[in-house]
Amino acid sequence: GHFLQHPILAADLCHLLLSLRGNTATYNQIFCTAGPEIAESRTYYEMIADILNVELQINETPVDVHLKENPNSAPFLCHRIYDLAKLKASGAHVPATPLKEGLRQHAESLITSNA
């Protein structure tokens, strides 16, 4: 629950990708991309529980215990934050949907598609 993440809304990612077309400043470049907010994993799941109006239960497992049982998961046990300065400087669309709003939109789309 303590690792930092930098999630992006799929619609923001699509907008970003479309903004690359014809933008020669982005050709042959590699960019990091993410949403505008960084959140601790615990906070991320608290937001989802709040949006769904359900109780959240988090059972933390110490990292060393998890790694011993799941050695292939090592690449995922880290903070995931990104510098968007190069993306912004290129003139491409920079994702701007606030995290809670993006989670709300995503949850609503999943609920309505399964209705």
What positions do the PLM features span?
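A conserved pocket-lining segment of Rossmann-fold NAD(P)-dependent short-chain dehydrogenase/reductase
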Residues: 1-8, 19, 32
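A conserved structural motif in NAD(P)-dependent oxidoreductases
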Residues: 5-13, 98
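Conserved C-terminal active-site "lid" loop/helix of NAD(P)H-dependent oxidoreductases
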Residues: 10, 40-42, 65-94
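Mid/C-terminal beta-alpha module of Rossmann-like enzyme folds, strongest
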Residues: 14, 19-72
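Generic structural signal for alpha-helix termini and adjacent loop/cap motifs
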Residues: 20-24, 90, 109, 113
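C-terminal accessory subdomains/tails of enzymes that are appended
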Residues: 47, 51, 70-76, 89-91, ...
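Amphipathic terminal alpha-helices
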Residues: 67, 97-115
